[in-house]
Amino acid sequence: MFNLPLTSVFVIFLFALSPIYGAFEYMQLVLQWPTAFCHTTPCKNIPSNFTIHGLWPDNVSTTLNFCGKEDDYNIIMDGPEKNGLYVRWPDLIREKADCMKTQNFWRREYIKHGTCCSEIYNQVQYFRLAMALKDKFDLLTSLKNHGIIRGYKYTVQKINNTIKTVTKGYPNLSCTKGQELWFVGICFDSTAKNVIDCPNPKTCKTASNQGIMFP
């Protein structure tokens, strides 16, 4: 009978207990409010709508990042595909031509996050999924329809509840150091078909009598 050394058995045991590399439990579509971002970083253009910051496959207990290799990204050559991405997912610190040529922002997000769902979505499918999920909600119009408009402060609870009314899931909010609404995370189950409450939402931290600015 073949006997494995005790150390080998221990390594195999640990590997069996580890999560499958690249497996994910949910996906978070991270939308950014360009005005808030551009108050912290010099921008080349400032869209007047929410734009995609990323689509992040993740696990509740273990953060997934960089599940592939640095050279896993393929430059997107298709013109309509690039245009569609730029409208929804622009690189705010670069001119349009530079963004679409170098694709640094898209590359960075895909290498860091997209590779963590590559067993299910290839690169083309990943970016198309991000665009499709973004198009499910007109977040800016929805906020306006619920009384949240630019230039005013609102409690974190009001913004959270409004977004949940629209998406049917509790969001993950992030703010700048100046307490401006920056990111809105909308979470989906692993099939990307159903909105869920975001696990472990960080949300914005404010004093009880202060709100956050929607600039």
Swiss-Prot record:
Active site: residue positions: H53, E109, H113
InterPro entries assigned to the protein according to its UniProt record, in alphabetical order: Ribonuclease_T2_eukaryotic, RNase_T2-like, RNase_T2-like_sf, RNase_T2_His_AS_1
Residues carrying sugar: N49, N59, N160, N172
Localization annotation: Secreted, Extracellular space
Entry keyword annotation includes Lyase: yes
EC class of the enzyme, as a word: lyase
Function: Self-incompatibility (SI) is the inherited ability of a flowering plant to prevent self-fertilization by discriminating between self and non-self pollen during pollination. In many species of the Solanaceae, self-incompatibility is controlled by the single, multiallelic locus S. This stylar glycoprotein is associated with expression of self-incompatibility in potato.
Protein name: Ribonuclease S-6
Lineage, broadest ranks: Eukaryota, Viridiplantae, Streptophyta, Embryophyta, Tracheophyta
